[in-house]
């Protein structure tokens, strides 16, 4: 019965294209915490006017009452006109009500659309320990390993070994597409298998996922496929977009469901190709495999109770750290500043590896606590043991982003004779080979 009600509710939302239960932040919460929501939006750099939103929502509620009152009057007149010949006065009243109701309904729809448009741009509230400022204001939390220096650029090295071909990739698909060949392709597979083995041992259930999602799923997860500067490839003429990360289909896995408290947390890991336009990345570190339009990735994802999410955030981070410690990479963990957070995240950690080529830190993986933001966007809830129902919390984290992982290994395990040392933990997945 509950699933049926969810489907009915979803159909109504699809018809109207306005679904207040699917707003990323609850309007009631925004009303009761207007200053906090406005400050958080400002800290994240989102141009949202909460006062305007609440004023429009007041208008919406007033119009809703007017529409309901007019509908009651219409129904009353219809009842009086049944069973006998109606007098002209009732007919005239009915005609006038029809005009007034259509007018009010039109105003209501227009106001609802304005409210919904603003609500979609209200970002999640940040945690109190998130640093203020932009990218340069993110704070180092911890560091691991010793820095190396003096390595050859990963692209020059890989090309010299005959392992990567961007020229032929560009010939068949355009810039930033590539072929991996021989031992480097095998090394990518080795990293994947190693990471998958480790992550599943930590309690994450492995899933393969759709490589496309509908726009509701993408938007509910906090992505904007049709927004300005979007990173997603939208399928023309279809309600579909290619995924930029397995986070998108994993978020949608439990859409419009009510989960049982006893089953949480649910931990998943999804492997998929990722497709990104990489709009707005010019001037950043983009050479070679570091930033491309297509790459493979193993993603971790969690659905949990609100009181579990901070602990699970640390768990996901610890899994990411353990993977790179075992491979043997120097890195640090950064608490990302508010101005560099996306809309869904209340807090995000980045792991940045030490590049011996550039002699600086470069982004490697990230993990985010999105609290109930995505869950509200896709109507994912939990029934408590006392019968109450509320939104779950969701979290995501990169186990390994394969193209970037290869950059890290190519930079850190080169030898003077031109060979590459295979990290010890990867050797069982490379037929026992120590060097390639």
Give the location of each predicted region.
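TRNA-recognition modules of translation machinery and tRNA-sensing kinases, especially anticodon-binding
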Residues: 143-436
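N-terminal alpha-helical targeting/anchoring segments
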Residues: 21-145
